[in-house]
Swiss-Prot record:
Protein name: Asparagine--tRNA ligase
Record's keyword terms, sorted: Aminoacyl-tRNA synthetase, ATP-binding, Cytoplasm, Ligase, Nucleotide-binding, Protein biosynthesis
Protein encoded by which gene: asnS
Example GO molecular function: catalytic activity, acting on a protein
Family the entry assigns: Belongs to the class-II aminoacyl-tRNA synthetase family.
Amino acid sequence: MSKQLVSIIDVPKHIGEEITIGAWVANKSGKGKIAFLQLRDGTAFFQGVAFKPNFIEKFGEEEGLEKFDTIKHLSQETSIYVTGMVKEDERSKFGYELDINDIEVIGKSQDYPITPKEHGTDFLMDNRHLWLRSRKQMAIQQIRNAIIYATYDFFDKNGFIKFDSPILSSNAAEDSTELFETDYFGTPAFLSQSGQLYLEAGAMALGRVFDFGPVFRAEKSKTRRHLTEFWMMDAEYSFLSHDESLDLQEAYVKALIQGAIDRAPQALEILERDVDLLKKYIAEPFKRVSYDEAIDLLQAHENDEDTDYEHLEHGDDFGSPHETWISNYFGVPTFVVNYPASFKAFYMKPVPGNPERVLCADLLAPEGYGEIIGGSMREDDYDALVAKMEELGMDRSEYEFYLDLRKYGSVPHGGFGIGIERMVTFVAGTKHIREAIPFPRMLHRIKP
């Protein structure tokens, strides 16, 4: 059998031709003289049909019956080489199918644990290494890949340089209570929460930089939106205003959505994602509302029949129900800007004339997906940053390199970060973030 293989996703290019596919058997059915094979190869799914008389005619009765019997007894996830003629077939949901005329078993699969029936979440997570093979899980990972590809493409086209920040650090970029600590040759070190502080150094050297890699948060959270290890894209840029930063973030998110539509249309179809709704998010401008305006809106509507959130006062932080209501109220991704400084990071620049608010923004995704981006302008004045650190009782010695950036040619600069898994969850339309990463790490899960 020829081993010059064709990927399933490329099969439509070979209608009327004989091809060979390397694939796994996702499912099979049929009876008597006919067998149907549901095949997958990582690029897509496809159906093959085998007719017993065709095998007898091609190979003779003994060998033909033996090969057809092999097909009839294939078990789920057996790997095979399968050869046949690609034929158009309107009855097939693919629009074409493979008329199988030869098969070779590569690797047998016995008692595959994830069968086509329903399974509980814990069972599926315990078998995550196998669950990834299922149709929907494959589709989610294909969307993840499309979003990552679009990330690199967007930043390349917008003049950014990939800048690799360290994973081990002696300081905290965000909340020091959420750090994973390790021993670094006798010195305490921490797994990175964000590459931002180092990226600011990159922005002072290279103008526009971004990084993409794993970050770690020791949050004891069990929500559907939190992981302890996830992949973060951080970007930093010099000489940009706050409004220009929001423009850039909006363009980036729209590029990611478009990237998924362009590169993973079959995946979106498998997940039954409303592509017209995604296109609406691209076509319409994102809404921008201040934190205080958002609080006023929440208070004005808190007694409406369809609301389900707790009362908030000015100065309170939003919970997930508040974020959901705000983004659904506007119907498009919504920037909430200028939060209170009291619950934002030390490095954020105050709003001119209003030191109790900072020049920051969270982008809230509609449909209940909540925050997907956090960004801000950074405090670029040395004395102001030192005063803020002293106010918070921070150890300046751990941030000398960061303060140096304000001593030697400081400029207005800002940046933002996006957890790729949250973006994948939003674009894919899935309900839980654990499916947006190949092997999720959560409060009580570190295997497989």
